[in-house]
Amino acid sequence: MQTTAKSSTPSITAVVAATAENGIGLNGGLPWRLPGEMKYFARVTTGETPSSDPSEQNVVIMGRKTWESIPSRFRPLKNRRNVVISGKGVDLGTAENSTVYTDIPSALSALRSTTESGHSPRIFLIGGATLYTSSLLPSSVPSLNSSTSTSPLPFSRPLIDRILLTRILSPFECDAYLEDFAAHTKPDGSKVWKKASIKEFREWIGWDIEEQVEEKGVKYIFEMWVLNQ
Protein backbone atom coordinates (compact mmCIF):
# COMPACT_ATOMS: atom_id res chain seq x y z
CA MET A 1 0.00 0.00 0.00
CA GLN A 2 1.34 3.42 -0.95
CA THR A 3 0.81 6.00 1.76
CA THR A 4 1.32 9.67 2.31
CA ALA A 5 2.30 11.47 5.47
CA LYS A 6 -0.62 12.56 7.59
CA SER A 7 -1.13 16.30 8.03
CA SER A 8 -3.88 18.73 8.96
CA THR A 9 -4.48 19.25 5.24
CA PRO A 10 -4.86 15.86 3.51
CA SER A 11 -3.24 15.45 0.13
CA ILE A 12 -5.88 14.85 -2.53
CA THR A 13 -5.11 13.75 -6.08
CA ALA A 14 -7.55 14.22 -8.93
CA VAL A 15 -7.54 11.48 -11.56
CA VAL A 16 -9.16 12.44 -14.85
CA ALA A 17 -9.06 11.77 -18.59
CA ALA A 18 -9.79 14.75 -20.83
CA THR A 19 -9.57 15.76 -24.47
CA ALA A 20 -7.51 18.70 -25.71
CA GLU A 21 -10.67 20.80 -25.24
CA ASN A 22 -11.02 19.43 -21.67
CA GLY A 23 -14.01 17.25 -22.51
CA ILE A 24 -14.49 14.50 -19.94
CA GLY A 25 -17.98 13.07 -20.38
CA LEU A 26 -20.97 12.45 -22.62
CA ASN A 27 -24.51 11.53 -21.57
CA GLY A 28 -23.41 10.69 -18.04
CA GLY A 29 -20.59 8.37 -19.08
CA LEU A 30 -17.20 8.33 -20.76
CA PRO A 31 -17.05 9.26 -24.48
CA TRP A 32 -14.41 6.57 -25.09
CA ARG A 33 -13.83 2.91 -24.29
CA LEU A 34 -10.16 2.40 -23.54
CA PRO A 35 -9.52 -0.74 -21.45
CA GLY A 36 -5.82 0.04 -21.09
CA GLU A 37 -6.54 3.47 -19.68
CA MET A 38 -9.06 1.97 -17.26
CA LYS A 39 -6.44 -0.54 -16.08
CA TYR A 40 -4.09 2.38 -15.44
CA PHE A 41 -6.82 4.13 -13.43
CA ALA A 42 -7.44 1.02 -11.35
CA ARG A 43 -3.74 0.43 -10.72
CA VAL A 44 -3.11 4.03 -9.68
CA THR A 45 -6.09 4.36 -7.37
CA THR A 46 -5.76 0.90 -5.82
CA GLY A 47 -2.01 1.06 -5.27
CA GLU A 48 0.59 -1.59 -5.96
CA THR A 49 -0.06 -3.61 -2.79
CA PRO A 50 -3.58 -2.88 -1.49
CA SER A 51 -4.19 -3.78 2.13
CA SER A 52 -6.75 -6.41 3.08
CA ASP A 53 -7.85 -4.05 5.87
CA PRO A 54 -10.48 -1.67 4.42
CA SER A 55 -9.44 1.10 6.83
CA GLU A 56 -5.96 1.10 5.27
CA GLN A 57 -7.04 1.04 1.64
CA ASN A 58 -6.77 4.02 -0.69
CA VAL A 59 -9.83 6.26 -0.92
CA VAL A 60 -11.77 7.21 -4.06
CA ILE A 61 -14.09 10.21 -3.73
CA MET A 62 -16.82 10.71 -6.32
CA GLY A 63 -20.11 12.46 -6.88
CA ARG A 64 -23.47 10.70 -7.04
CA LYS A 65 -23.63 10.72 -10.84
CA THR A 66 -20.16 9.21 -11.11
CA TRP A 67 -21.16 6.46 -8.66
CA GLU A 68 -24.31 5.72 -10.65
CA SER A 69 -22.37 5.69 -13.93
CA ILE A 70 -20.26 2.76 -12.71
CA PRO A 71 -21.85 -0.54 -13.82
CA SER A 72 -23.49 -2.17 -10.81
CA ARG A 73 -21.29 -5.26 -11.12
CA PHE A 74 -18.23 -3.06 -10.54
CA ARG A 75 -19.66 -1.11 -7.58
CA PRO A 76 -18.07 -0.46 -5.22
CA LEU A 77 -14.63 -0.15 -6.82
CA LYS A 78 -12.83 -3.06 -5.19
CA ASN A 79 -9.85 -2.78 -2.85
CA ARG A 80 -10.62 0.91 -2.32
CA ARG A 81 -12.72 2.85 0.17
CA ASN A 82 -15.55 4.36 -1.85
CA VAL A 83 -16.78 7.78 -0.74
CA VAL A 84 -19.81 9.30 -2.48
CA ILE A 85 -20.56 13.01 -2.15
CA SER A 86 -24.21 14.00 -2.42
CA GLY A 87 -26.36 16.64 -0.78
CA LYS A 88 -29.46 14.59 -1.58
CA GLY A 89 -28.19 11.26 -0.34
CA VAL A 90 -27.55 8.06 -2.26
CA ASP A 91 -28.88 4.55 -1.78
CA LEU A 92 -25.72 2.43 -1.75
CA GLY A 93 -27.71 -0.75 -1.28
CA THR A 94 -25.49 -3.51 0.07
CA ALA A 95 -22.25 -1.98 -1.21
CA GLU A 96 -19.44 -2.69 1.25
CA ASN A 97 -16.66 -0.28 2.20
CA SER A 98 -18.75 2.63 0.87
CA THR A 99 -20.04 5.75 2.60
CA VAL A 100 -22.05 8.85 1.65
CA TYR A 101 -21.19 12.37 2.84
CA THR A 102 -22.81 15.69 2.04
CA ASP A 103 -19.53 17.36 1.10
CA ILE A 104 -15.80 16.70 0.79
CA PRO A 105 -14.77 18.46 4.05
CA SER A 106 -17.14 16.19 5.99
CA ALA A 107 -15.66 13.15 4.26
CA LEU A 108 -12.10 14.24 5.02
CA SER A 109 -12.94 14.83 8.67
CA ALA A 110 -14.38 11.32 8.94
CA LEU A 111 -11.42 9.79 7.11
CA ARG A 112 -8.96 11.43 9.50
CA SER A 113 -10.77 9.87 12.45
CA THR A 114 -10.73 6.36 10.97
CA THR A 115 -7.14 6.04 9.75
CA GLU A 116 -4.18 5.01 11.82
CA SER A 117 -1.80 7.65 13.12
CA GLY A 118 1.47 8.24 11.29
CA HIS A 119 0.42 7.61 7.70
CA SER A 120 -2.80 7.75 5.70
CA PRO A 121 -3.88 6.00 2.51
CA ARG A 122 -3.83 8.06 -0.66
CA ILE A 123 -7.01 9.96 -1.45
CA PHE A 124 -8.21 10.29 -5.05
CA LEU A 125 -10.96 12.46 -6.51
CA ILE A 126 -12.41 10.66 -9.54
CA GLY A 127 -15.30 12.87 -10.69
CA GLY A 128 -17.54 14.22 -11.86
CA ALA A 129 -17.27 17.67 -13.41
CA THR A 130 -18.92 19.53 -10.53
CA LEU A 131 -16.57 18.09 -7.90
CA TYR A 132 -13.54 18.63 -10.13
CA THR A 133 -14.49 22.29 -10.62
CA SER A 134 -15.15 23.03 -6.95
CA SER A 135 -11.92 21.29 -5.93
CA LEU A 136 -9.77 23.06 -8.52
CA LEU A 137 -10.90 26.56 -7.56
CA PRO A 138 -9.24 28.42 -4.65
CA SER A 139 -10.59 27.21 -1.33
CA SER A 140 -10.20 27.86 2.38
CA VAL A 141 -7.09 25.67 2.51
CA PRO A 142 -4.22 27.69 4.11
CA SER A 143 -2.20 29.96 1.84
CA LEU A 144 0.68 28.53 -0.18
CA ASN A 145 2.54 31.82 0.18
CA SER A 146 5.03 32.12 3.01
CA SER A 147 5.06 35.03 5.40
CA THR A 148 7.87 36.57 3.35
CA SER A 149 5.98 36.36 0.05
CA THR A 150 5.78 39.53 -2.03
CA SER A 151 2.42 38.54 -3.48
CA PRO A 152 0.00 41.45 -3.03
CA LEU A 153 -2.85 39.21 -1.92
CA PRO A 154 -3.04 35.91 -0.01
CA PHE A 155 -3.63 32.86 -2.16
CA SER A 156 -5.92 30.09 -0.94
CA ARG A 157 -4.86 26.91 -2.66
CA PRO A 158 -7.28 24.48 -4.29
CA LEU A 159 -8.56 21.54 -2.29
CA ILE A 160 -6.56 19.14 -4.45
CA ASP A 161 -2.78 19.37 -4.77
CA ARG A 162 -2.05 16.91 -7.56
CA ILE A 163 -3.68 15.98 -10.87
CA LEU A 164 -3.09 12.77 -12.79
CA LEU A 165 -4.29 13.71 -16.25
CA THR A 166 -4.76 11.38 -19.18
CA ARG A 167 -4.81 13.73 -22.15
CA ILE A 168 -6.88 12.18 -24.94
CA LEU A 169 -5.36 13.46 -28.19
CA SER A 170 -8.13 12.24 -30.49
CA PRO A 171 -11.32 14.33 -30.80
CA PHE A 172 -14.50 13.15 -29.06
CA GLU A 173 -17.94 14.65 -28.66
CA CYS A 174 -18.44 15.72 -25.03
CA ASP A 175 -21.06 17.53 -22.96
CA ALA A 176 -19.15 17.68 -19.66
CA TYR A 177 -15.88 19.55 -19.27
CA LEU A 178 -12.96 19.85 -16.90
CA GLU A 179 -12.04 23.23 -15.48
CA ASP A 180 -9.11 24.70 -17.47
CA PHE A 181 -6.78 24.42 -14.48
CA ALA A 182 -3.61 25.02 -16.53
CA ALA A 183 -4.76 28.60 -17.14
CA HIS A 184 -5.29 29.39 -13.45
CA THR A 185 -3.01 32.07 -12.01
CA LYS A 186 -2.19 33.43 -8.57
CA PRO A 187 -2.58 37.12 -7.66
CA ASP A 188 1.09 37.69 -8.58
CA GLY A 189 0.48 36.34 -12.09
CA SER A 190 2.34 33.04 -11.63
CA LYS A 191 0.69 29.78 -12.58
CA VAL A 192 -1.15 27.78 -9.94
CA TRP A 193 -0.19 24.47 -11.54
CA LYS A 194 2.97 23.13 -13.15
CA LYS A 195 3.48 19.92 -15.09
CA ALA A 196 5.83 17.47 -13.40
CA SER A 197 8.51 15.62 -15.31
CA ILE A 198 7.87 12.06 -16.44
CA LYS A 199 10.58 10.99 -13.96
CA GLU A 200 8.70 12.63 -11.08
CA PHE A 201 5.46 11.06 -12.32
CA ARG A 202 6.94 7.57 -12.42
CA GLU A 203 8.45 7.96 -8.96
CA TRP A 204 5.11 9.02 -7.50
CA ILE A 205 3.02 6.21 -8.99
CA GLY A 206 5.73 3.62 -8.43
CA TRP A 207 6.18 2.06 -11.85
CA ASP A 208 7.73 2.80 -15.25
CA ILE A 209 4.69 4.07 -17.13
CA GLU A 210 4.82 4.81 -20.86
CA GLU A 211 4.38 8.51 -21.52
CA GLN A 212 2.29 8.07 -24.70
CA VAL A 213 -0.02 5.21 -25.66
CA GLU A 214 -2.15 4.35 -28.67
CA GLU A 215 -5.16 2.12 -28.08
CA LYS A 216 -7.94 1.32 -30.54
CA GLY A 217 -6.61 4.05 -32.80
CA VAL A 218 -6.81 6.61 -29.98
CA LYS A 219 -3.61 8.29 -28.82
CA TYR A 220 -3.28 9.60 -25.29
CA ILE A 221 -0.55 10.77 -22.96
CA PHE A 222 -0.15 10.50 -19.20
CA GLU A 223 0.71 13.65 -17.26
CA MET A 224 1.08 14.67 -13.64
CA TRP A 225 0.47 18.25 -12.51
CA VAL A 226 1.34 19.61 -9.08
CA LEU A 227 0.77 22.88 -7.27
CA ASN A 228 3.37 25.49 -8.17
CA GLN A 229 4.57 26.36 -4.67
Swiss-Prot record:
The gene is DFR1. Substrate binds at residues 37-42, 80. This is Dihydrofolate reductase. Monomer. Key enzyme in folate metabolism. Catalyzes an essential reaction for de novo glycine and purine synthesis, and for DNA precursor synthesis. GO terms for molecular function: dihydrofolate reductase activity; NADP binding. Its EC number is 1.5.1.3. One of its GO terms (biological process) is dihydrofolate metabolic process.
